[in-house]
Amino acid sequence: MKRLFEKVFGSESEREIKKIDKLADRVEALDEEYKKLSDQALQSKTAELKGRLSQGEALDDILPEAFATMREAAWRVLGMKHYRVQIYGAIILHQGRISEMKTGEGKTLMATLPVYLNALAGKGVHVVTVNDYLAQRDCEWMGKLYEFLGLSVGVIVHGITIEQRRAAYNADVTYGTNNEFGFDYLRDNMVIYQKDMVQREQNYAIVDEVDSILIDEARTPLIISGQGEKSTKLYHIVDQFVKTLKIEDDVSLDEKANSVTLTEDGGTKAEKAFGIENLADMNNMELSHHINQALKARNLMRLDKDYVVKDGEIIIVDDFTGRLMFGRRYSDGLHQAIEAKEGLQIQRESKTLATITFQNYFRMYRKLSGMTGTAKTEEDEFRAIYNMDVVEIPTNRVIVRDDQADGVYKGEQGKFEALAKDIEGRYKKGQPVLVGTISIEKSEELATLLKRKGIPCEVLNAKHHEREAEIVAQAGRKGIITIATNMAGRGTDIILGGNPEFLAKREMKKRGYADELIANATSHHETDDEELQAARKVYNDLLEKFKKETEQEHKDVIEAGGLHIIGTERHESRRIDNQLRGRAGRQGDPGSSKFYISLEDDLMRLFGGDKMLSIVEKMGLEDDEAIEHGMLSRSIENAQKKVEGRNFGIRKHVLQYDDVMNKQREVIYGERKKVLAGESLKDHVLNMARNIINEAVAIYTADAKYPEEWDLVGLGEYLAGIYMQRATLSFDNIEELTVETLQEQIYETSEKLYEAKEEEIEAERMRELERIIVLQVIDTKWMDHIDAMDQLRQGIGLRAIGQIDPVRAYQVEGFDMFNAMINSIQEDTVKYLFNVEPQAKVERKQVAKPIEASHGDGNRKKAPVVKEKEAGRNDPCPCGSGKKYKKCCGE
């Protein structure tokens, strides 16, 4: 029915494109007029358009003129002009939607149109990329356009200073990675002086490779950690124990669910080894947690796939890009467990100081849009979570790539032999081949096999990331075989026959030209600078030379069939497979793609089912014979759909939990901002005192009908324990009191006490003390609360056994814990400020110093902490803070 509807009325995307057709006409209609403008007249358009906005016009009103200005600037500065399809994509981005644009269609240039338009409002535009290289490259490349038109540009990459960050965020256009934007937001909400904040409000963001950032990485929270206090000895001891355990007998391993646990026998062995009666006992929670993480490190985390060992450190490999993630650590003790497994020095476990998911960070933007070559398969998720729909942008030229049927083999060895034979044949006729593997281990295994056959190849994986751009840019040259992990090199165009611009720049770099001079030498705008003119001549001469070389090579490669893509196994997501295929056939070039699959591949083994294997066994095929059966293709797609559905469920589940923390985070961070910006917090502190008084009075008068029956002695003792001297409380004419007059009487006494304290200390110093103490109390309590909520979340899953919705239970109990934290913040703040001594030296300092920014582990397992009975005063606090009840929520 859907297909019939689309045949008659066109697809949803085609209908959306028709709606913006006339707007694109208006942009192109200005082309001739803007060509005639001088550089100065074109540059003055920026001030003119800003003026129209200040007079009340909307961004939509000035869109045609803004787009036409940027199109002409792009031609003058870069020698590039936006195609009509890029105008379509740009309008979609401006509308806060996702433009699905195929590889090589010019997403980077397309984005300059909505970026320029939205930057005119003066509130900042963020262009988000997946790695530092692309952020730096795009900023230098496209930044020339914005600067030509009088806008400022900044870039946020790992390792720059606070001052550089602030300057970059204050620019009209800011390029950066998703990680840096997210971590800067968290760091801004940990500063102790407002001047140390770097970000502005989240206004408008365009997310490049939006599927990678908002879908693939959505399960993994960003975490800023401080140094923990726990000893690291237990990690080594537990690792030695776990090493002795046997799969099935002692350990239950479920690769499909990515989980590993002790069996009953394994639990008995653990109890015997560590001399305890019951591993599940709450007192053994820490040991149980260490064992779980050691099991995961030993059985689920694989060297050269999930991580590499470099210079005595564990470096995480990004699961989606295959890149090394320097400076990132697994949280929750998993990193330490891997260090123990590999026999490295163990660094202390960290304490979470601040955390947020990408989902909740990017949902803070007033307007959010994205671009990618593959998003349509995930449109339901984009709609459900981000309220963004996906519009497919037509290609500038028809795609002629030949996507061949999968080659399915019984075993992995047969598969590798077959694809090596395929590569050998293509190498001999000069056809370039890009091979996509899913791990470093597989890429190096294949490279070794090819070298044995005398086939030279370039290997691009996390171990060789420094040459990434160079390797990918030349992957379209004659007879070049490139092996790349997953989607490494994404964002760099593969041009058939080689990239003359890249070759010219590389030659200039060899000759000693500075990067900035090379970047300016590639532009076309007018200049009087003699050094730049000379560099431009050198660049143009080199460009002509390399164009001649690559032109003939381009023809040879096209004759050989264009770029051929080989996938060494199917990814969990169809979208990732499509991304790999999309590297070939750019801008109407010929090309082809083929996936080689074995029934031993993880996806097939875990989700393909035994049914497929039994069919193959009956066919009696040899290992190196390809299997062709309609059912196999359907099974592969069904396996991928199963995994995609499961992963969507996990991401949705993560978001349901993080939404609870997100509301709490907004309250705390909002409170911090008020404290940092406020001149005086006196009223705020007195209001806290009023809240304490009102609640205390309500409790100590609750069970009595008459004022004479109120527990005023208990009330006095309670308030004296917080901030008020017992002698200052006296009540006359008790029988005439009401709850309200009692509250007011105590508040007036409190106000006088605070005035006296202020007089004793001096008003100016009191204002600074208020800020220092409120910030320190908020930060201390919030960090403890993050830990407590994490403990609650790990244990809440058990509620499902009792027919209780775990998410609902988490919301209710999390709300109770948050209220307890707010009360605790109020009590501690009032206690410290009412009792501060004049000679006390109190300085503004961070409660805990961040030592690292890391990605959480999306599949963490932790021993459960379940709130059961009412705690005694000396019992551990049920909130999970680790303190005694009387020193925590029972204060």
UniProtKB/Swiss-Prot annotation:
One of its GO terms (biological process) is protein transport by the Sec complex. Pfam families: P-loop_SecA, SEC-C, SecA_DEAD, SecA_PP_bind, SecA_SW. ATP binds at residues 86, 104-108, 493. It catalyses: ATP + H2O + cellular proteinSide 1 = ADP + phosphate + cellular proteinSide 2. Zn(2+) binds at residues 877, 879, 888-889. Signal peptide: none annotated. GO terms for cellular component: cell envelope Sec protein transport complex; cytosol; plasma membrane. It comes from the Bacteria. It is a peripheral membrane protein. HAMAP family: SecA. Belongs to the SecA family. This is Protein translocase subunit SecA 1.
